[in-house]
Amino acid sequence: SPVAASYRATAGLAGKALDF
């Protein structure tokens, strides 16, 4: 998910949790 990729770049683990 492109949105999740942005979260991973900034939040790391939070991005994985928000993988939608």
From Swiss-Prot:
UniProtKB keywords: Acute phase, Calcium, Disulfide bond, Glycoprotein, Secreted
Domain of life: Eukaryota
Occurrences of domain Pentraxin (PTX) (ranges): 1-20
Post-translational modification: Glycosylated.
Gene Ontology cellular-component annotations: extracellular region
Predominant cellular place of this UniProt entry's protein: secreted
GO biological process, one term: acute-phase response
Subcellular localization: Secreted
Record bears the keyword Ribonucleoprotein: no
Ranges annotated as spanning the membrane: none
Glycoprotein listed as a keyword: yes
Subunit relationships: Homodimer; disulfide-linked. It is not known if it assembles into a pentraxin (or pentaxin) structure. Pentraxins have a discoid arrangement of 5 non-covalently bound subunits.
Function: Displays several functions associated with host defense: it promotes agglutination, bacterial capsular swelling, phagocytosis, and complement fixation through its calcium-dependent binding to phosphorylcholine.
Family the UniProt entry places it in: Belongs to the pentraxin family.
Protein name per UniProt: C-reactive protein
Native source species: Mustelus canis (Smooth dogfish)
